[in-house]
Structure formats: C-alpha cells, structure tokens
Amino acid sequence: ARRRRRSSRPQRRRRRRRHGRRRRGRR
C-alpha cells in the first residue's frame, strides 16, 4: 500500500479510484 503524507490543510474532495493501476506500458 502507498503511504500518503499528511497535508497541512484538510482534504475536501475525495478522489475515488476504481482500478488502482491503470498505467500504460509494462513494468
């Protein structure tokens, strides 16, 4: 899992991700 840094200002919007890895190309 990825750790997020706590931001100084509270987050108003939540972003919803459906499929976590959607990147083009292969790793």
UniProtKB/Swiss-Prot annotation:
<keyword id="KW-0238">DNA-binding</keyword>
<dbReference type="GO" id="GO:0000786">
    <property type="term" value="C:nucleosome"/>
</dbReference>
<keyword id="KW-0226">DNA condensation</keyword>
<dbReference type="GO" id="GO:0005634">
    <property type="term" value="C:nucleus"/>
</dbReference>
<dbReference type="GO" id="GO:0003677">
    <property type="term" value="F:DNA binding"/>
</dbReference>
<protein>
    <recommendedName>
        <fullName>Protamine-B</fullName>
    </recommendedName>
</protein>
<keyword id="KW-0158">Chromosome</keyword>
<keyword id="KW-0544">Nucleosome core</keyword>
<dbReference type="GO" id="GO:0030261">
    <property type="term" value="P:chromosome condensation"/>
</dbReference>
<keyword id="KW-0221">Differentiation</keyword>
<comment type="function">
    <text>Protamines substitute for histones in the chromatin of sperm during the haploid phase of spermatogenesis. They compact sperm DNA into a highly condensed, stable and inactive complex.</text>
</comment>
<keyword id="KW-0217">Developmental protein</keyword>
<dbReference type="GO" id="GO:0007283">
    <property type="term" value="P:spermatogenesis"/>
</dbReference>
<keyword id="KW-0539">Nucleus</keyword>
<feature type="region of interest" description="Disordered">
    <location>
        <begin position="1"/>
        <end position="27"/>
    </location>
</feature>
<keyword id="KW-0744">Spermatogenesis</keyword>
<dbReference type="GO" id="GO:0030154">
    <property type="term" value="P:cell differentiation"/>
</dbReference>
